[in-house]
C-alpha cells in the first residue's frame, strides 16, 4: 500500500461554511479545548499541548479584515510556526467559532456520526498502529477511490 499523508476527509461540502457571517472576525475555527490523549503521534512525533491547539487545521479566513493585513509574504516567512498556528496577531474575540463537526479529531474525541470533516490528527490508518480507529473504513474507501483508475466510460 502506498502511504498517503493527507489526514482529513470532508464528508460535506465546505461551501456551507461560506454562509457564516465574517464581517467583524479575522477568522473562524473550531476552538478545540482539550489535552491530547496521545503524547506521541505518527512516526514517533511529539504531540504536545499548547494554546489554541489544532485551531489552524480548518480555518475560514476573512482576507479583508484589517488585522490580517500583517500577514505579508515576508512576515509569514520570518514568523515561527507557533506564532502563525496560534493566530497570535488576533485577539480571542476576533476569532469566531466553526461548528465542531467541521474538525472532528479522531481518537482524541468520542466518535460522532454527524462529523462533516474527520481529522486523523494522531495518525492516519495508513500507519500500522492506527489501522483500526474511528472512521478508518471511510479512510480506506477514500484511499481506494483515490488510487483506482478513473472510469471514463470509454
Name the predicted role of every residue range:
Residues 55-154:
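A glycosyltransferase accessory/donor-loop signature
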Residues 43-48:
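Short, P/G- and charge-enriched loop/turn segments at secondary-structure junctions
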Residues 5-8, 50, 139:
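Generic detector of bulky aromatic hydrophobic side chains
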Residues 19, 50, 108-110:
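Short secondary-structure boundary/capping segments
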Residues 1-37, 60-67:
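GT-A fold catalytic core of metal-dependent nucleotide-sugar glycosyltransferases
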